[in-house]
Amino acid sequence: MKLKKENLIFRFATEEDAEKILKIYEPYVEKTTITFEYEVPSAEEFKGRIREILKEYPYIICEYENEIIGYAYAHRIWNRAAYQWDAELSVYTDGNYAGNGIGKKLYKILIEILKLQNIVNVYALVTYPNENSEKLHNYFGFKKVAFFENSGYKFGKWVGVTWFEKAISEYPKNPKPIKKVSEIDEVKLKQILEL
């Protein structure tokens, strides 16, 4: 479905958005191997996920005519201290709006915010095959850095996972401390959301 891009609104998610976001995620769980979850999470569990991510990282939604039609978020990919400059990205869009560039816009916003947080590397774990996701990551200049064959089992088949990586800043000799998303200047965040 084509949409009027000037009517798109990008903003930070809130816990109150959980049920609407879950409506987008549900078909990915129930009908695809794009996510390795077997069961659709409850609204309460999803609220908790949003709350936890927003403690440190961005969780962005795209609204169109008062409906959430896409979302993207980042989170810490590994727990050891030396990995703190790395983040994993995820993006999901309502299938009815595929081909409108929503995923690209969400990713662009996410990456710009992560730069302000002093994140250096971003990663995406993409089930194989997933042509649309591969195109998205190629568009942003991600490199394929690993392929794990048969690493997940869903719907009676084994599925591989491709790891994509992108450096979003230089590799400083002494990296700056990571900032929580709440520590970023609100004016700068507003400008990024309106890119």
Where are these regions (language model features)?
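Glycine-rich phosphate/pyrophosphate-binding loop shared by adenosine-nucleotide-utilizing enzymes
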Residues: 8, 67-71, 159
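Active-site acidic-Proline motif in GNAT/NAT acetyltransferases
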Residues: 91-96, 100, 112, 128-129
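Conserved acetyl-CoA-binding loop-helix of GNAT-fold acetyltransferases
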Residues: 99-113, 135-139
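Conserved GNAT-fold acetyl-CoA-binding loop/helix
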Residues: 22, 26-49
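Conserved catalytic-core motifs of GNAT/GCN5-like acyltransferases
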Residues: 123-126, 138, 143-160, 169-170, ...
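Acetyl-CoA-dependent GNAT
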Residues: 41-96, 107-108, 167-168
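Conserved GNAT acetyl-CoA-binding A-motif
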Residues: 114-126
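A short beta-loop-alpha structural element at the N-terminal edge
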Residues: 9-21
